[in-house]
Amino acid sequence: MDAMKYHDLRDFLTLLEQQGELKRITLPVDPHLEITEIADRTLRAGGPALLFENPKGYAMPVLCNLFGTPKRVAMGMGQDDVSALREVGKLLAFLKEPEPPKGFRDLFDKLPQFKQVLNMPTKRLRGAPCQQKIASGDDVDLTRLPVMTCWPDDAAPLITWGLTVTRGPHKERQNLGIYRQQLIGKNKLIMRWLSHRGGALDFQEWLAARPGERFPVSVALGADPATILGAVTPVPDTLSEYAFAGLLRGTKTEVVKCLSNDLEVPASAEIILEGYIEPGEMAPEGPYGDHTGYYNEVDNFPVFTVTHITQREDAIYHSTYTGRPPDEPAVLGVALNEVFVPILQKQFPEIVDFYLPPEGCSYRLAVVTMKKQYAGHAKRVMMGVWSFLRQFMYTKFVIVCDDDVNARDWNDVIWAITTRMDPARDTVLVENTPIDYLDFASPVSGLGSKMGLDATNKWPGETQREWGRPIVKDPEVTARIDAIWDELAIFK
C-alpha cells in the first residue's frame, strides 16, 4: 500500500502505522480533558497520530492528531511530501479555469490532468460498511460516543471532525462542510455553522422554498482522509468535494444513500448521524475554546435532531481539539498553504509566494511576495487576495513584499516593513468587511476592518525621493574569504 492508494480511514491508519506515524495508546485515558492534554503535547513535538484504544467509560476507540504534521496532511491528499501539494494546487487551478489544448503537444502535456478527471464521478453503492450497525428511534444515544471535552470551561462535549452533508432545495450537488456540534442530549446537537458557509446557505434556501418543513442533514464521522480534506480545500464551485476526493485518492469516491433521507454519505465512514433541523429550533452554543486561543461568546444556532446512528463494526471515533496555535487546524493551514499558491498564481502570475503563518490562527494574516511591475501594483494584489478565494474573506492583515523577501522568514518581512513602508502612505484600511464570528476584537460580530501593508520598494509616482539601494556583497571578495575561511579557524 502506498500513499496514493488507500481506500478508507482504516487503510490509511495501516499506512501510518507501517511508517511509524501512528501510536496506539492502551492505557485508559479520559475523553474529558485528558486526551486533549496528551494530543496537544504530542502535536507540539511533531509526534504521531494517536489511537486511544481504551477511553475511560467508552467501548469505542478515539483517533486524534490524525493531521498533526504537514507530512500526514500530504499523505492524506495522496502525496509523499508537502512540496508535492503544489501539484494539487495546479490541478485545482486547472479545474477552476480549464483551458482547451492549443495543439497536439499541449494535449499530450495535459493528458495526466484529463486522466485524473476520470476519477471524479462518485460510485453509488446499495449497501455499505457505514451501515453495518443501525440504531434508530429510542435506541439513538449520542452519549455512547466518546465525544471529547477539550478545555476546562467548555460548555459540553463537542463533536469536532463531523463532515456535515446538506443539499439546497434547488441544487443537484451536495455540500460538505466541517462544523462543530455541541452535545445537548441523547439525540440532540447544536449545529454551529456561520451564515456564509455552504450548509447554512443550503438551510436558508430550504426555509425560503419549503417554509416549516424539516431540513435533512447527515454527518459523517471517520471518513477517509481525502474526503475530509476535500471539505477544507478551495475546490471550484463547479466541483463537488466527493469528486475532488476521488482525484486525490486516485479512485472514485464510494457513497451510499442514507436510510432516512436522500443525502449520500461516504460509504466507508466509521459513523453516520442522520436527522433533521426543525425550522425555528435554536439553542445557545458555547462557550468553547477555539483556534484563536480564547473562549468564544455564546450565540444561538440551529438544533440538529438525530434520528439514526449507523456505523461500522468496531467503529473508531475521529476527533480533535482547537486551541492557540499550533493545533491541528494550524497544521492543516501550513499544508494547504502549498495548495493555495498555484491557484493564486494562475490569477495573479506576478505572485512569487504566499504564506499564512500558523501563529496568525491559520488565515488571519497573509504574507505575499511578488514581482512588482508598476506603481500601485501591491495594492491590486492585496485586494485580489481578499476577493479571489472565499477562504481569505476573513484574512485581517495582508502584507505585500517584493520577491527579494522570503515570505516565510519574519526577519525578512519585518525588515521590509520597517525600511520600505511609510505608515500613512502604505497602509490600506478597509472598514465594514466580513470578519470571523469568533473574532471578538471586531467592533460588531461578523463585521470588522482589514489592513493591507505595502512593504514593497516604491516606484515613481509612489514617492518623490531617491529610493535606497540594498547592500550587496562583492562576490569576488566572498569567494576569496570562502577559500581561506577554515584556515582562519575563528570558531575553533
From Swiss-Prot:
GO function terms (MF aspect): 3-octaprenyl-4-hydroxybenzoate carboxy-lyase activity; metal ion binding
Chain residues that bind prenylated FMN: I178, Y179, R180, R192, W193, L194, R197, G198
Secretion signal, residue range per the UniProt entry: none
Principal cellular location given in the protein's record: membrane
Keyword Cell membrane: yes
Location of the active site: D290
Catalysis performed (reactions): a 4-hydroxy-3-(all-trans-polyprenyl)benzoate + H(+) = a 2-(all-trans-polyprenyl)phenol + CO2
Cellular component GO terms held in the UniProt record: cytosol; plasma membrane
Primary enzyme class: lyase
Family: Belongs to the UbiD family.
Name this polypeptide is given: 3-octaprenyl-4-hydroxybenzoate carboxy-lyase
Species this protein is from: Salmonella typhi
Lineage: Bacteria, Pseudomonadati, Pseudomonadota, Gammaproteobacteria, Enterobacterales
Gene name per UniProt: ubiD
